[in-house]
A protein has these predicted regions:
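Extreme N-terminal tail/first-helix region
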Residues: 1-19
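Short, P/G- and charge-enriched loop/turn segments at secondary-structure junctions
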Residues: 6-8, 23-24, 106-109
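Short low-complexity stretches enriched in small and charged residues
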Residues: 1-4, 28-36, 73-78
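Short, surface-exposed loop and linker segments with low hydrophobicity and enrichment for Pro/Ser/Thr
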Residues: 10-13, 36-37, 113
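Short, structured beta-strand-loop surface elements
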Residues: 51-125
Length: 125
């Protein structure tokens, strides 16, 4: 089953945008927001456009089990902060390649130094 979930996560990462569902803890309300997602040679990554102030990001740190969905297709994933500079550079390149031409201003924002620490690896569970 984990292989199927991982395959679906990679498939969803091909989408321009996904929705991420987060909650601070099991008793808290569920929140859903649209975000960008990128596949890299190191894994699948997401990042908070609002930096560390983003609610979904804060909730994902507090409760790293999230749901990533496109329409009716969804996968449960565990997110974990990425600190490796080599991987961060690969994620930057993936954002540029996937979004840079169509959304140059928004992509530039996603590559700001203040946003980079919000890079999270998504691992299907």
């Amino acid at each position: 089953m984990a292989k199927k979930a991982e395959d679906l996560l990679w498939k969803l990462a091909e989408s321009d945008e996904v929705e991420i569902e987060t909650r601070r803890d099991a008793k808290s309300p569920l929140h859903r927001v649209t975000i960008w997602i990128v596949p890299t040679e190191y894994g699948v990554y997401v990042r908070s456009y609002k930096g560390k102030k983003g609610r979904w990001y804060q909730e994902a740190l507090a409760n790293p089990l999230v749901t990533i969905r496109v329409g009716r297709r969804k996968v449960t994933a565990r997110v974990e902060p990425e600190h490796n500079p080599l991987v961060i550079r690969a994620v930057n390149a993936a954002y540029r390649k996937k979004y840079g031409e169509r959304w140059p201003d928004e992509t530039k924002e996603m590559l700001k130094r203040s946003i980079l620490p919000t890079t999270l690896r998504s691992i299907a569970v």
